[in-house]
Amino acid sequence: MIKFRKRCKVSENIKILVVDDEPTVLESFKMILKIKDYDVDAFLDGPSALEKIEKGKYDIAFIDMKLPKMDGLEVLKKLKEADSELEVVIVTAYATDASHANAINMGALEYLRKPFLMEEIYELVDRGLRRRRRVKTPKESATPKPPEGIH
């Protein structure tokens, strides 16, 4: 008898956090990400998102740079403190080389300029997931371990 294994969808269990103070941008993100069946939580400000990060685990976050209450870099810092493996993309319409470098130095995966294309979002999700898998994969030791039970 031949058994076929069920193939899991790539998007299965992928949770994405989006924070942007513009409702139309949030809706665009949700629409783009739901095409791939990603599970998306969207918030209009950083504090609302940070409350959720304690309750759930996200794979990727897209955070607007200019937000009310706290800016995107502050949200990035707090997200990384709560979950160092979370991949964060800073999104902005006001990109400068200095702010790009600052975001990367603070641990951002990338800096996405508005307006963006659907393909850019998908590429960043894929890149973030690949990076998370590399981080989670235990690195093999250069020196082999001695066999257990032999003295």
Per-region residue spans from a language model:
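Two-component/phosphorelay signaling modules centered on CheY-like receiver
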Residues: P23-D41
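The feature encodes the CheY-like receiver
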Residues: L26, P68, T96
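Acidic catalytic/metal-coordinating carboxylates
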Residues: L44-D45, D71-E74
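Short amphipathic alpha-helix used as the core "switch/output" element in two-component signaling
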Residues: E51, L73-E85
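Active-site beta3 strand of CheY-like receiver
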Residues: K57-F62, L67
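C-terminal output helix
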Residues: A98, F116-V125
